[in-house]
Amino acid sequence: AVIMCVSDGEKILLGRQATWPEKRWSLLAGFIEPGESPEQTVVREVWEESGVKVGHVRYVASQPWPMPMGLMLGFEAYAPEQPIAISDELQAACWYSREQLRGLIASGDLLLPDALSISRSLIMRWLDAGPQDRVFWHTEAGKGGQP
């Protein structure tokens, strides 16, 4: 399975499922289909769940995942902020700036995944990133990519 931190460098895409605890938000995730690379899965799953087109994708980390006894592969993916068209898999999805996300977390209006989850780790990695960490997403042409 894959889980992805989708960002334009300044905003992050988070979603929530109706079955989750109230106020819980997380990253989008999905299962790899036969014949598909993990990177292709990231692009497909983000599109299917949110209608957002992803550009560059890079692997970050993995975590053993108990259901269905597998491995969760964590990715970062570039996508310029764009309108969201949620699928029936999600109750809601939204782009959040670092300032917005910090405020919602501090007020208790948004709950992150459990502290030991790869989802939480990827969100905090993005939230704590400084300008030097965001260079990856900017090119001379103004589109996402590696310098």
What residues fall within each predicted segment?
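N-terminal strand-loop-strand
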Residues: A1-L27, F31, K53-R58, A77-A79
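Active-site-adjacent beta-strand/loop module that shapes the phosphate/pyrophosphate-binding cleft
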Residues: Q63-S87
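Active-site lining segments that contact anionic ligands and/or coordinate catalytic metals
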Residues: V54, V60, G70-G74, L90-Q91, ...
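Peripheral (non-transmembrane) domains and long loops of multi-pass membrane proteins
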Residues: E49-G51
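Hydrophobic alpha-helical positions that pack around
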Residues: L28, V42, V46
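Surface-exposed, charge/polar-rich loops and edge strands
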Residues: E36
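Nudix hydrolase/Nudix homology domain
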Residues: P21-W25, I86-P147
